[in-house]
Every structure is written in structure tokens, then in C-alpha cells.
Amino acid sequence: MNRREFLCATAATVAAGALLPRAASAEEVQKSEGMNYAPKGKPNPVVGPGEFNIAAIRLDHNHIYGMCNGLTEAGATIKWVWDADPKKVAAFLEKFPGAKVASSLEEVLADPEVKLVACAAVNSERGPIGCTVMEAGKDYFSDKPPFTTMDQLNQAKATVAKTGRKHMVYYAERLHNESAMFATDLVESGAIGKVISVTTIAPHRLSKASRPAWFFERDKYGGILCDIGSHQFEQFLTFGGCTDATVSYAAVGNFGNPDKPELEDFGEACLAGDSGALDYIRVDWFTPDGLPVWGDGRTFILGTKATIELRKYIDVARETVGDHVYIVDAKGMQHLSVAGKVGFRFFGELILDCIHGTEKAMTQAHAFKASELSLIAQAKAQRVA
């Protein structure tokens, strides 16, 4: 199938999908606060009940709900939940009432039926917890960022090599976004030719009053490029077809929050990938209150034969539903609305990878490289405000 045939066939498939029962749309997901964003999709189990038991621990960030949504829709069974805060545990049980409450992390790790542990601890604690989990013979699924220091990354690499376990990362801005997964397929098919440049714009809503204290402590959250920048570096590696990249420029600043001096509310970086592709990312905490979603995330992919623009969470002033894909090539222009029509295959692939020791969902090298680039960019960043 040539490039044009692929695009036409894809458009026809998406159009036909409009006649099928839809998954929960972006409008049906709570989207105004990024920290509460937990996408839901169509159940697509790859295992039966009780065949792949997991635990959810350290519920410091509400991304744990998106992580568990994806895993349970793929067939995983949440056997345990553990956190030192009983209020967090009670809230989790409202969403996942079948989980049992563990008295400690040790109780979770002692259960031979638990195959994977999902964790959304304070950013700076995720890496060390992962090593403990892997040493206990479990695979580990961390919220992003998985690390806040290079030492943590190196420790995790050593633990993976020693134990043979997985340390996967919830890079949700691609893995849990249908437009981004659709673009992944377009790029990998060769539909836009060789990728020259990737640009990701990722504004987020700060919601300062509802954030925990650790969110504003530099040593605990890691810096803006380490944190929400990690999503963008992962997307560049994927869309750019890169296994490595060089950070040529990075900057961070605090432009609007003098009462939180350790917060970085703006960051940007430029990278050059080993495939020849170039990258620019911008991240910030300045989503205006008038936007009904947590951020107007955009991705622009320039290929030698076509361009792609993703309007991930909203089409501003036009549609509040997200997952818009705009494609332009030599033959014309297309706008595809893919919400509810692509799904979130990463989670099922991750479960099968854990069972079979494969790497279809994501390679370990890729997961770690995205974090490594974010740490390098953070360390190199010039403070501009």
C-alpha cells in the first residue's frame, strides 16, 4: 500500500467508525485539571479476570487512576491498593472497589500473584520505589517522571539488568491519547515520508491552590523539563524515529509565580536526534481559566511528503472534544476526528510483554532514554526568569 492509499484507507476507517458504538469521548472525561485527567476507553482485555494481578501503590498523584483505567480495560485485576493516607485509599476504592487494602508495601510485594505494581508516588521517590519492586520480582509501572536525578536512572538501569524485570513509564500524552497513537501509526507507516522536525507545545493548568506542597519543591518534583518535559521527549523519540538525541538548548523560568520560588512555570528545549530529525518543545503552567480543558496540547510533525498537526485535547473555539488530526500532503488536506476510534493499545501490549518477556508496548531503552533526555535538558537549562 502506498502513502496515499494508506491515508485514504485510514480516513475511510475513521469515518466508518462514526457509525459504531463510541468509547467515552473526551467530553465525558474530567479534563479541566491535568492532575485529575484519567482517560477511559473501550474494554479490550488481553487476559481474563485474575490472570494478571496488579497492585496500585503510593497514590500521591491522581495519574494513578489513568494508569489503572488503562490496565483494567486491558484485563488486569487490581488485587491490592496501598498508601499511608487512608483518605487516598478510600477515594481509590470508590473507583476500583474490588481492590483489597494492604497494610504495607511489604504485604503487596510478598504476594506471588502480583505481577506488576503501578505507582504514582512523589516524583523524587518513584525511582527508588521501582528498584524495591523489581528486587521483589515484580514488574513496575511508574507515573512520569520516573526519576528526578541521573543517579536514580542509573540505579534503575542496574536493577533492570540484575533482575530482568521491567520498569515502564506512563508517558500519557502519547500513550493515553488517541490522536497521538493515530499519528504514531501514520509516521511508522511512512505516510508522511522521512520526519524532519517535531514540535510539541504542552501548556498545563497550574491549579495552584489544589496542588500538594511537594509539587512546589524543586528537589521533589524535579523541574519542569524533567517533569512534564519528559512527555515531549518521549514523543520526539517516537515520531522522529530516534534512539538517542543531543540537547542543544534548554531554558526554564518562573515568570508568574513569585510566591512559589522553586516552581518553574515555563520551559523549552531544542534537540537533534540520531535519525536526523530535529525537535522543539515548550512546556508551561499558564493555561488560561477560560479554556475548558487542562491544556491546549499541540504536536506538529513535518515530513518530507506530508505534515501532521495534532490538537489533542480541544480544538479551540470550535470543539471541546479533542483528538483532532490534520494531515496535508501533495494531494490535499484532511481533518480526522479520532476520539473513541483508536483506543489505547499500550496497556494490553504491556500486560502481554510482562507475561511473555517481550517489548512490543515500549522498549526499556526507549522508556529510559526519554527520561535521560529530560534530566539532561533540566541540568543544562538556562534560568531566564
Predicted regions and their residues:
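NAD(P)-dependent dehydrogenases' Rossmann-like dinucleotide-binding region
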Residues: 170-175, 189-210, 224, 228-232, ...
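C-terminal helix-rich "cap/oligomerization" subdomain common to oxidoreductases
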Residues: 8-20, 24-48, 116-118, 274, ...
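A contiguous active-site-proximal alpha/beta segment in oxidoreductase catalytic domains
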Residues: 124, 147-209
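Short polybasic amphipathic segments
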Residues: 299, 316-330
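Contiguous beta-strand/loop segments that form the cofactor/metal-binding neighborhood of enzyme cores
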Residues: 34-45, 50, 234-316, 346-360, ...
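Beta-loop-alpha module in the N-terminal Rossmann-like domain of NAD(P)-dependent dehydrogenases
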Residues: 60, 96-159
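N-terminal Rossmann-like dinucleotide-binding module
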Residues: 26-96
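Active-site loop of classical SDR/Rossmann-like NAD(P)-dependent oxidoreductases
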Residues: 62, 337-348
